[in-house]
Amino acid sequence: MGRTCDVPGLDEWTFKIVIVINGAQLRGVITDWGGVLTTPILTTVQAWIQADGIDWDSYRTVMRAWVVDAYGPDASQNPVHALERGECSGAEFEQILAARLLRTDGRVVTADGLLQRMFAASMRVPAMYDMIRAVRGAGFRTALLSNSWGCDEYPRADFPGLFDAVVISGECGMRKPEQAIFLHAAKGLGLEPEQCVLIDDIEANVAAAAACGMTGLHHADAAQTAAALGDLLGVPLDGADPSTGTGTPSPGNTMR
């Protein structure tokens, strides 16, 4: 199977829809945030790399090690784990990352505000927002399940109209792909895992959700996801924009 995880620091991609179906009656949809309801994380990070003059090789070397470790079968504790579980503050993570990065002009990377700058180009994908509203309007329960890179930037005022439950990794001390966080999200909807669809742009998270009984849907773009989800739920989910490169500015710029 090709690499399908949309994670900053990994630059080789095979985008496709991957669906793992459990056969149960589906009553809830749980969605990731960054890279699903927002434009792709890789695109966002590349914009920051260029704007801040970051040496791409230094960033890729650091993030490859941390991300592979974070999602590998023998994952051990590293700064990504700590940040996503809320065990490390955003400011602490910025110091750790900045110390390992290089700039193309040889200057020191500024740690303060690094995460804000890194995700500043993140844009909402209106078609995905419309899809979630349509799912909820059809009587299904909806939840947000996000690995946070800082917990204070989500557009929470929008959440009551979108979600019946919200699970942020840094607020619950768990992170994807740990199975406990998927079970926690299902419980927040009052459902069994087998009654839920998980939408995520990282295939490791889709596989982990499927392992605990959920139907997993790997997100590649809005049109494909809406079509696949509509087929799963048996409801029309029209109007998804086939381009994830368009959207509106998102204040939620430090989460995945």
What are these regions (language model features)?
Residues 105-142, 179:
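Short, acidic loop-to-helix structural element flanking the phosphoryl-transfer center
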Residues 19-71, 212:
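Active-site neighborhood of HAD-like aspartate-dependent phosphohydrolases
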Residues 52-65, 72, 102-116, 235-242:
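Short, surface-exposed acidic
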